[in-house]
Amino acid sequence: MAAQAAPELAKLDLNKNTGSVEANAVSAGGSEKEEAENEGDSEDDRDDEQAGGSAEVNAEKKKKKKRPKKKKKTAKVQSSPPRIPLTTLFPNNNFPEGEIVEYLNENSYRTTNEEKRHLDRMNNDFLTEYRQAAEIHRQVRQYAQKELIKPGATLTDIAEGIEDGVRHLTGHMGLEEGDSLVAGMGFPTGLNINHCAAHYSPNAGNKVVLQHGDVMKVDFGVHINGRIVDSAFTVAFDPVFDPLLTAVKEATNTGIKEAGIDVRMSDIGAAIQETMESYELELNGTSYPIKAIRNLNGHTIGQYEIHGGVNGKSVPIVKGGDQTKMEEGETYAIETFGSTGKGYVRDDMETSHYAKVPNAPSVPLRLSSAKNLYSLINKNFGTLPFCRRYLDRLGQEKYLLGLNNLVSSGLVDAYPPLCDVKGSYTAQFEHTILLRPNVKEVISRGDDY
């Protein structure tokens, strides 16, 4: 759940060669008898020498030890579809690090400061979990880009293909109680087409097919022990949309560059907007300015809490507003959205995304279906977002009444799809960054974006 709506909508990782023995012929001389004797002697000598040579060769062979056959090393290559758990490919848990960016200006001392380096080394488990999740995200999205996301594919096949890959690579299929809380999907796969910017995932029975002229945002999360990597990209098959994708990708990279310890959110937002809105898209002879979607934001990420929980912070993508500063040790989803429409999203279409409200007050539930469903949500997802397909996968049936009751009771939040005006096109790019004590790490960075 990459997108965090602005306040007004927030409510809603690979035989020694032996020489031959030669006998010397005896020179002719003397009588024929002597010649015969000498000839016989030489043959005997030759036989002796050959016998000696054979024994010597056999002795050498016995001395030589047979070298054990080298075991073939297993190539560190993921299968297609991705099914090999990442811990099998990286048995020592030395997962690839993300892009390391040194702090600049007044924070440049942090790169070499020994105290900060010591604090960073203390976060070993934290980094290992995040890097594992990030490498799973990279491997699954690369597979999705090559094999799943094609014109003619259904959104259901794409979403389930991504989610099956994540579950196999984490080693947690999520069918046993509590298994999804150990590792797995950080939130449901968002497949947002054209004017829809965020929070759309196919529900059961969805028949939507991806078209050649579509612009689709692919947004999914991977978690290990609640450490969520949140990253998204946009796919368009028609090159006419390249300026839109470039604008948003560059805006996200600007946000990543500007982010850092003690940096004000408003400064990041202003830089993002300036970059994005320097582009325009020409479509059917008409030029459309690319606008930053002003009521969508980046956000902090907490353990098991995609939007950082009660004390979460937002990262705007337009100028003005929040003067809050980023702090050491925080994790952020830096994401930007661009649109050819109004640059403002509203709730639209059927809801698929839900999440339990953290620290919600105790509320008496009258419906037994709501009570049972709430217990299942607690045991299998906790505060991690889920979608209706995940409930179907756990064998739940006829749960909508109970689910709606949990939403109306304030125990579960519903996250409807967020859309700009119909006919417009939107794009999104997103990375998870860690503000480590001595460096900034773009944990989800890959060769693709």
From Swiss-Prot:
Q: Which GO terms describe its biological process?
A: proteolysis
CDD domains found in the cross-reference section: MetAP2 (cd01088)
Compartments, as annotated in UniProt: Cytoplasm
Q: Name one molecular function that GO assigns to this entry.
A: initiator methionyl aminopeptidase activity
Name its species.
Answer: Trichophyton verrucosum (strain HKI 0517)
Q: Which Pfam families match?
A: Peptidase_M24 (PF00557)
Under what name is this protein listed? Methionine aminopeptidase 2
Where is a divalent metal cation 2 bound in this sequence?
D230, H299, E335, E430
Q: What is its EC number?
A: 3.4.11.18
Instruction: Write down the required cofactor(s).
Output: Co(2+); Zn(2+); Mn(2+); Fe(2+)
Q: What is the lineage of its organism?
A: Eukaryota, Fungi, Dikarya, Ascomycota, Pezizomycotina
InterPro entries cross-referenced by the UniProt entry: Creatinase/aminopeptidase-like (IPR036005), Met_Aminopeptidase_Type2 (IPR050247), Pept_M24 (IPR000994), Pept_M24_MAP (IPR001714), Pept_M24A_MAP2 (IPR002468), Pept_M24A_MAP2_BS (IPR018349), WH-like_DNA-bd_sf (IPR036388), WH_DNA-bd_sf (IPR036390)
By sequence similarity, the record places it as follows:
Belongs to the peptidase M24A family. Methionine aminopeptidase eukaryotic type 2 subfamily.
For bias kind Basic residues, which ranges apply? 61-75
Q: Which HAMAP family match?
A: MetAP_2_euk
Sorted alphabetically, the keyword list is:
Aminopeptidase, Cytoplasm, Hydrolase, Metal-binding, Protease
- Keyword Cytoplasm assigned to the entry: answer is yes
Alphabetical GO CC annotations of the entry are: cytoplasm
